[in-house]
């Protein structure tokens, strides 16, 4: 059984993921521009369509994972997905700190601009909260039916919102 402190840490990280993902989904064009900037930074051939699609997919995935953490759905799986995503975000923000390109992180889409150092510190704090929330491995709860229903509703609304934002 997860303690209240661990649940609060999981909810805090989940809410950051939800807000970050929704802000990316709200502005698919802006998110696509951010992804294109990352393509240039990483020397990947850029494509506006691929960048826009990847931006929306990233926003939907972040929001979905965030809702799963908030509602404590599949905690054994979610902890590994979040740890992997957060590790990738942290390494990418470390690269931004080291090479200091003329771009912002895009963590919260075009809505909130953070410096490279602010992004890196945010990612370190989130990584710490993840470790507090989900480790040791055997401390998880069993998901209840209402959690599945709430999570599924949240995912459906997020995907619907993403489709609406894409076309309008």
For each predicted feature, which ranges?
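Aromatic-anchored segments of alpha-helical transmembrane domains
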Residues: 18, 87-94, 156-165
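Hydrophobic alpha-helical segments
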Residues: 3-4, 8-12, 16, 29-139
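Internal/C-terminal transmembrane anchor helices
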Residues: 143-168
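Helix-to-loop transition at the C-terminal end of transmembrane segments
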Residues: 22-27, 167-168
């Amino acid at each position: 059984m997860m303690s209240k402190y661990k649940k609060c840490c999981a909810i805090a990280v989940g809410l950051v993921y939800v807000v970050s993902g929704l802000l990316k989904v709200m502005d698919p064009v802006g998110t696509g521009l951010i992804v294109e900037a990352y393509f240039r930074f990483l020397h990947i051939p850029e494509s506006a369509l691929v960048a826009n699609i990847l931006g929306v997919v990233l926003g939907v995935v972040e929001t979905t994972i965030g809702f799963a953490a908030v509602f404590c759905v599949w905690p054994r799986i979610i902890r590994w997905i979040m740890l992997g995503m957060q590790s990738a975000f942290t390494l990418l923000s470390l690269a931004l700190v080291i090479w200091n390109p003329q771009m912002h992180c895009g963590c919260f889409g075009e809505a909130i601009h953070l410096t490279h150092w602010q992004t890196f510190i945010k990612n370190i704090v989130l990584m710490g909260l993840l470790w507090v929330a989900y480790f040791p491995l055997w401390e998880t709860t069993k998901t209840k039916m209402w959690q599945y229903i709430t999570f599924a509703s949240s995912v459906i609304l997020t995907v619907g919102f993403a489709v609406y934002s894409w076309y309008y």
